[in-house]
A protein has these predicted regions:
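Hydrophobic faces of well-ordered beta-strands that scaffold small-molecule active sites
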Residues: 26-28, 59-63, 94-96, 130-132, ...
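Boundary/entry segment of secreted carbohydrate-active catalytic domains
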Residues: 1-24, 29, 65, 132-134, ...
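Aromatic-lined substrate-binding rim segments of carbohydrate-active enzymes
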Residues: 28-64, 104-132
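Aromatic-lined carbohydrate-recognition surfaces of secreted/lumenal glycan-active proteins
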Residues: 1-3, 57-70, 114-149, 193-206
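Short, acidic/polar
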Residues: 2-20, 70-87, 143-155, 182, ...
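Aromatic- and acid-rich polysaccharide-binding/catalytic face
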Residues: 28, 91-104, 147-179, 230-235
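Active-site groove signature of glycoside hydrolases
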Residues: 27-34, 80-111, 228
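Substrate-binding cleft of secreted/luminal carbohydrate-active enzymes
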Residues: 159-175, 188, 195-249
């Protein structure tokens, strides 16, 4: 969930809908590097966290560093990790969404910044559960110029899990593509990092039951610890939710 404002009424119904569909974890963005504040929508964020906890869900908060201002990125990441809701709830984990390339155009400098950010993030939050949301290996196979030498292995010591953005619909909107890319991205990310992998799927607006079924089966077969589609607002078809609930089994 990221497309909301600071009115709790804009996000609480989304959380309720997720819970009603059987989702066990809510993923929600805390802010962006261009936002005016470290927590962009604190009222809505707190309301979403409280609603999710009331419904027995886990909640992961994420922030996308741009690496052009290291202190800002670290400060905003820590603000998300330390955030406490009006009812005293805290997030279960934090996701560093490491994909933005325009903040530091030079590949080598950006890679060094991503590693430094990850190291300092862990140093500042030694007991937090941290995940790295990353460009999937198959994406860099077909577009290596996006981020040459993406530092999967170098970042691995600082994270508990990796979450590749396995958006197979950018390559093909069919079950075979969903199956192939999902399995390859789980296996390759595990090989590169040595860490558990939670494979993200999508884009939800372009998928059907067959694609999602293939995605779920491939993810489970390859050893992913979980999964879900990006994003909730565009996950419209009931039959898609039926397939996604297989992750809960």
């Amino acid at each position: 969930v990221f497309d909301h404002n600071d009115d709790p009424a804009s996000v609480v119904p989304l959380v309720r809908g997720l819970a009603d569909h059987g989702a066990r974890t809510l993923y929600i963005e805390s802010s962006r590097f261009k936002a005016p504040t470290d927590i962009q929508y604190p009222n809505a964020l707190g309301a979403a966290l409280d609603e999710a906890k009331a419904r027995g869900m886990r909640v992961v908060v994420w922030y996308p560093p741009a690496f052009d201002d290291m202190e800002r990125d670290l400060r905003r990441s820590r603000a998300a990790i330390d955030f406490t809701s009006p009812k005293g709830n805290r997030f279960d984990a934090f996701g560093a969404d490491i994909e933005y390339t325009e903040g530091v155009p030079d590949h080598a400098q950006r890679t060094a910044a991503a590693i430094e950010y990850s190291r300092r993030l862990r140093e500042g939050a030694p007991d937090a559960v941290l995940a790295s949301i990353v460009i999937p290996p198959t994406s860099l196979e077909v577009n290596p110029g996006r981020w040459p030498g993406f530092p999967y292995a170098e970042m691995a010591p600082f994270y508990d899990a990796f979450m590749p953005m396995n958006y197979w619909t950018t390559r093909g909107k069919d079950a075979n593509t969903a199956n192939d890319l999902t399995e390859r991205n789980v296996v390759e990310t595990k090989r590169l990092t040595g860490k558990p992998v939670h494979i993200i799927g999508g884009l939800a607006e372009y998928v059907d039951e067959a694609q999602v079924g293939a995605y779920v089966n491939a993810a489970r077969r390859a050893g992913s610890i979980g999964g879900g589609l990006y994003d909730y607002a565009s996950t419209k078809r009931p039959e898609v939710w039926d397939e996604l609930r297989a992750f809960n089994g």
